């Protein structure tokens, strides 16, 4: 006669033990954070930075025109060119230079506004990736660009924190691109400020010629900084997209 199998004893207390509830998420020191796509803002920022580059190239041409007029004043006088002709050429060069300055200012203001929106977007995304990897508050991500002296160092620090939080897990921190962009940005700001003051004080043809050359150098630095900024924006945007797609925890956030 075959005996039915004896029932196996249940583990002690298993029937009465409720299933474990999921652990609550760790609190974030910067407030609620959720992933939002930075792609559209990143592309818009890159396009507007391209507009900044175009305005800077226009400014280089205008500065070169001023340089050329100032350098040929003496030669033109010796060659018999009338004073009226020289004044007309100088006025045209000055008008072109003024138009370039307005173009640069307009392009920079629009690009900076969209860049800041993108910057805040990637900062919040970075908080999802690493809530505790940011030494500065979220509000500083915006205001740090406008506070004198602070804006020379803190935006770069915040960008570095965003970059590190967005890089693939297990990879080393590589901030060479960020550092190169920030270096050219700061040098361009400083050189531009001094050359603008020098250009305003220039009176003689030689002084005007020197100031125009210095302005061309400043515009060239701005162009390099803008090119590097485009690379930073597009690369960081891509890093965040790939991290969100490949990190289950981040994707759920």
Where are these regions (language model features)?
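Extracellular/periplasmic helix-loop-helix junctions in multi-pass membrane proteins
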Residues: 194-223
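Membrane-interface extramembranous regions at the lipid-water interface
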Residues: 2-5, 16-94, 114-143, 150-186, ...
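N-terminal hydrophobic alpha-helix used for membrane targeting or insertion
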Residues: 45, 107-110, 211
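Hydrophobic, aromatic-rich alpha-helical transmembrane segments
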Residues: 94, 98-105, 174, 208, ...
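Hydrophobic alpha-helical transmembrane segments of multi-pass membrane proteins
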Residues: 99-113, 143-149, 187, 216-224
